[in-house]
Amino acid sequence: MKNKSACFFVLSLFVCSMFTSCNKESTTECQTIDFSTLFDGQPEKIPLKEWAKSIHFVQLETNDSILIGNIRATILHKDKILVHHNNLSLFDLSGKFICNIGSKGGGPTEYSGINNAWTDDEGIHIFDIANKIKTYNWNGKWIKTEPIPESNIKEVFPLASGNNIKAGYIQNITGNEPHKIYLFKDSTILAKIPYGKSFQKGEMTMVFYNECYPFHANGRTFFKEMFNDTIFSIDNQYQPVPRWYI
């Protein structure tokens, strides 16, 4: 339990420090965030109310039509909560169930499975495990299907700049993948971000889902890889810029 408390403390401090730095400074110079001194003492409990402006507990409605399994992610979009579990389910801020988003299946308006999802004013976008992006409206109905430019892409996220430009992340499972991120619009590739090094594949391979964590702040796009100590931003030329060393 102490280890879990310490990890939560470090994660919380990192997130708050990162956003404070991002909000207060416009410099593009890479900064170092040093957590090493935090491990010298004992973990300390910090009330959530000291970190948040307000706290709300939302109990999600469940019934015969909606049974929540293992929750992989939640997305807050204006006055709605999107829950990614076995499916995608939409709730209002009180936890009342609104609808399911699409349905699983092999039909043209269905999805085979969900790699990840994101939202905008147009609706809910699902990166299907069948290597297509399915878009649904806020009533859960299918709108369109888009291709992706590279079949090895495992995660897709939109850029903060908008204009329907997306980034597709490729895990370096083989050890010799040439590029980690493809920047694309529709099926047209705009730029590629290369891997910095290769490695010899071992006898056993372990694959992690969501190996790349993207986020937006102040109109910019950032990403952090699981096995990389640097947080990068993506500039206007679609190139990675080191922003923080951890």
Language-model segment annotations:
Residues 56-66, 98-109, 141-147, 190-203, ...:
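A short beta-strand motif characteristic of beta-propeller blades
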Residues 184-242:
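Loop-centered beta-sheet repeat module
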Residues 34-36, 76-85, 122-128, 163-175, ...:
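Short beta-strand elements that form the blades of beta-propeller/WD-repeat-like
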Residues 43, 52-87:
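Beta-strand-rich domains and repeat architectures in extracellular enzymes and scaffolds
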Residues 18-21:
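C-terminal motif of bacterial Sec signal peptides marking the signal peptidase cleavage site
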Residues 61-66, 70, 91, 96-129, ...:
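Blade-loop segments of beta-propeller domains
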Residues 25-60:
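Blade/loop signatures of beta-propeller domains
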Residues 69-73, 111-116, 151-161, 202-212:
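Repeated scaffold domains used in trafficking and secretory/extracellular systems
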